Amino acid sequence: PSLDAALWRKLCWNVPFNGLSIAGGGISCDAILADPSLMNRARVLMEEIRSAARKAGHPIEDSFLDRQFEVTATMGAYQPSSLIDFLDGRPVEVDAIWGEPLLRGRRLGVEMPTLEKLNTEIRQALKQRG
């Protein structure tokens, strides 16, 4: 697969799990999986990323998305790297993980309302953190 295809696949995990851990107030992956509404939101975020990837010529199959949840379930109380950066007061890669995929999706004509909301929530959390 091309580098672009690999990046879209990586975003299928990074966007929801890094993002919801910050937007959820500093929660680990197991807490996301334990909350039906957060788990659903994670799936919707993955679907939005997949739609943009498909429009960009990089189809991602359902089984790949399913596998993201299966692997994450084995991680326990894992804290994604962006959450650790957020909690430690370090810079968070907001543009690379949430901003750029949103921008690319828009350019491709893909509606990504859940990602747009998450992007806003993360930026607000960073402002509040100071």
Set out the residue ranges of the language-model regions.
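Active-site-proximal catalytic alpha-helix in oxidoreductases
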Residues: D4-C29, S37-R50, A77
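NAD(P)-dependent Rossmann-like dehydrogenase/reductase catalytic/cofactor-binding core
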Residues: A31, M39-G130
